[in-house]
């Protein structure tokens, strides 16, 4: 019984509204999520149960089957890439790729095995802004 109480107490420290039990709806299930990162360069898109991961060395990319999960504060796609576990987490928040004047509406964290990368994302309905565009 003590371990259950301890687990419950730790769960109260989770971010967000603890009474909100609805999955995040910031990206519709039918939207295509485009993502990119630099240092090293990588990118791709996720749609439905498929994710295509691209690099300069593999511009056609590798397409894998993924599971989509909408949590309380974002969206994730999980599958196996290059023989290892892969998760792409998408969360709302302004993002800059550091190489262009674009501002993206989502940040992404890509983990392939032990390798973790940060990047940006957008959808066809929620695009990026160039510095010359007004909000």
Description of each model-found segment:
Residues 8-10:
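Bacterial signal peptide processing site
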Residues 15-38:
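Post-signal peptide N-terminal segment of mature Sec-exported envelope proteins
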Residues 30-89, 124:
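Central antiparallel beta-sheet cores of small beta-barrel/beta-sandwich binding domains
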Residues 102-135:
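C-terminal partner/receptor-binding element of secreted or periplasmic proteins
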């Amino acid at each position: 019984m003590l371990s259950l109480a301890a687990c419950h107490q730790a769960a109260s420290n989770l971010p967000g509204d603890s009474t909100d039990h609805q999955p995040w709806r910031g990206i519709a299930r039918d939207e295509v999520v485009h993502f990119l990162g630099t240092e090293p360069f990588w990118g791709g898109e996720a749609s439905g149960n498929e994710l295509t991961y691209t690099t300069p060395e593999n511009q056609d990319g590798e397409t894998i089957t993924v599971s989509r999960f909408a949590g309380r504060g974002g969206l994730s796609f999980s599958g196996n890439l290059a023989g290892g576990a892969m998760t792409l987490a998408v969360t709302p928040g302004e993002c800059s790729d550091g190489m262009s004047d674009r501002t993206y509406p989502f940040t992404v964290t890509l983990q392939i095995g032990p390798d973790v990368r940060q990047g940006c994302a957008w959808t066809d309905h929620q695009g990026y802004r160039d510095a010359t565009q007004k909000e």
